[in-house]
Amino acid sequence: MATEKFETALKKLEEIVRRLEGGSLSLDESLKAFEEGVRHASFCSKKLDEAERRVEVLLKRKDGSFSREPFQPDE
């Protein structure tokens, strides 16, 4: 999964959720799918955290110049 892309992992996670919500899996199949889903969710979360750390915002100062600041999301 180390070389997997975020978009690929997210699509796999969405498919796992659809399969689990479908209700046609056995208990063993459901547990296996759930474990795989947790791995994909963790991978996606880590990728999003990495992306957030890399995002910077350009802020305009009073004197007209710009400064780069870390992105601070509204929570």
From Swiss-Prot:
Subcellular location: Cytoplasm
EC numbers, comma separated: 3.1.11.6
Known catalytic reactions: Exonucleolytic cleavage in either 5'- to 3'- or 3'- to 5'-direction to yield nucleoside 5'-phosphates
GO biological process, one term: DNA catabolic process
Tagged with keyword Nuclease: yes
Gene Ontology CC: cytosol; exodeoxyribonuclease VII complex
UniProt keyword Disulfide bond, yes or no: no
Role this protein plays: Bidirectionally degrades single-stranded DNA into large acid-insoluble oligonucleotides, which are then degraded further into small acid-soluble oligonucleotides.
Subunit structure, as described in the record: Heterooligomer composed of large and small subunits.
Family to which this protein belongs: Belongs to the XseB family.
Protein name from the UniProt record: Exodeoxyribonuclease 7 small subunit
Organism: Pelobacter propionicus (strain DSM 2379 / NBRC 103807 / OttBd1)
